[in-house]
Swiss-Prot record:
Keyword Protease (UniProt): no
Boundaries of every RRM domain copy: 25-106
The organism of origin for this protein: Mus musculus (Mouse)
Gene name, Swiss-Prot/TrEMBL: Rbm18
SMART domains membership: RRM
GO MF annotations in UniProt: RNA binding
GO cellular component: cytosol; intercellular bridge; nucleoplasm
Positions of the UniProt region annotated as Disordered: 166-190
Name of this chain's protein: Probable RNA-binding protein 18
PROSITE patterns registered for this protein in UniProt: RRM
RNA-binding listed as a keyword: yes
Length: 190
């Protein structure tokens, strides 16, 4: 009996090895042809297993509003299904472009130098980015804090920072016109 070993292209093997570090079964599929539809891509992905979640992204504003962004995300039921999709689809031609299939990575919040926030990973689940962040303070506590701040500002106006001066139109204040405006005087100045 012979044992058949399946050889992977080097690129796909490195992509699959990255998957051992991944939690979940979420893939990023990029370099999508603008003519490929959400329906056709979903039907293609369903050949590899049960699709739990599929996010096909579109431009929300600007000149390309309503057009596909050129990438999507897909969650498979099992890791084996996701790995099989990577093996079969990465580098394959879909319409006029070669697909790029990778493990989806959690976005990392960029460090803002103005704030002392720590870098926090954003969840892979799209629902987490759409839900408002919950805080420990209730709405009424926030309102009371703002009212107290406004009251304090009204009682102690800051003398160091006076209000901005009224805009002047760079018109000499005391110079009054003694002659009427004439175009001939303007032409002679040129």
């Amino acid at each position: 009996m012979e044992t058949e070993t399946k050889t992977l292209p080097l690129e796909n093997a490195s992509i699959l090895s990255e998957g051992s570090l991944q939690e979940g079964h979420r893939l990023w599929i990029g370099n999508l042809d603008p003519k490929i539809t959400e329906y056709h891509l979903l039907k293609l992905l369903q050949k590899f297993g049960k699709v739990k979640q599929f996010d096909f992204l579109f431009h929300k504003s600007g000149a390309l509003e309503g057009q596909p962004r050129g990438y999507c995300f897909v969650n498979f039921e099992t890791k084996q299904e996701a790995e099989q999709a990577i093996q079969c689809l990465n580098g394959k031609l879909a319409l006029s472009k070669k697909l790029v299939v990778r493990w989806a990575h959690a976005q990392v919040k960029r460090y803002d130098h103005n704030k002392n926030d720590k870098i926090l990973p954003i969840s892979l689940e799209p629902s987490s980015s759409t839900e408002p962040a919950q805080s420990n303070l209730s709405v009424t506590a926030k309102i009371k804090a703002i009212e107290a701040k406004l009251k304090m500002m009204a009682e102690n106006p800051d003398a160091e920072y006076p209000a901005a001066p009224v805009y002047s139109y760079f018109k000499p204040p005391d110079k009054k016109r003694t002659t009427p405006y004439s175009r001939t005087a303007w032409k002679s100045r040129r």
